[in-house]
Amino acid sequence: MTEFIPLFAVRRNYGDVSGTRSVYLTFDDGPNPFCTPDVLDVLTQHRVPATFFVIGTYVANQPELIRRMVAEGHEVANHTMTHPDLSRCEPAEVHDEVLTASRAIRSACPQALPRHMRAPYGIWTQDVLATSAKAGLAAVHWSVDPRDWARPGVDRIVSSVLAAIRPGAIVLLHDGYPPGEERSCTDATSRDQTVRALSYLIPALQRRGFEIHPLPQLH
């Protein structure tokens, strides 16, 4: 029987670990050749870092985007190899999903050293946490989810984040789609709402006194 883990047992925010009003931008389900470059362009324009939780099968096809992420100061993190519901996987499958994804990341860019892992769909089990820990990966969930994947509109994405943001918050956004849904992301318009929202959101957060930082490395 699968032992599910309550969300309070998984990292959802970082409090105020730096003594500043820090917040953390994270992106799931890339890299995607149509969407990810636009996200990176906005981050570069505003000179802020982010963490990209990437899917290993996409990494193998888009190594240049992984190298660009690292070159521009972003963290590349583990979102498994094929984005399955890990609660339906045997322990050996969980192990393979996590470790193979980390290998794919390092193969694409040896300078990329994954330090964090996020379970697909945010479904955590004891096997997932144990495997992540053994692989040296900190398990990270999120505390702010504007559901940008559903394309609710740019204004809704921005307002949802600003209404929920707190010091230490981890914001969930998307720069791609999971395997099986990738046909939904065949041009730059697929995540255009996320990209446009991001261009408004970053200065709005900064005006409110928040600082955008990389996810902390916990020892």
Curated annotation (Swiss-Prot):
Pfam families: Polysacc_deac_1. InterPro entries: Glyco_hydro/deAcase_b/a-brl, NODB_dom, Nodulat_NodB, Polysacc_deacetylase_ArnD. Its EC number is 3.5.1.-. Residues 21-213 form the NodB homology domain. GO terms for cellular component: cytoplasm; membrane. GO terms for biological process: carbohydrate metabolic process. The active site is at 28 (proton acceptor), 174 (proton donor). Belongs to the polysaccharide deacetylase family. This is Chitooligosaccharide deacetylase. The lineage of its organism: Bacteria, Pseudomonadati, Pseudomonadota, Alphaproteobacteria, Hyphomicrobiales.
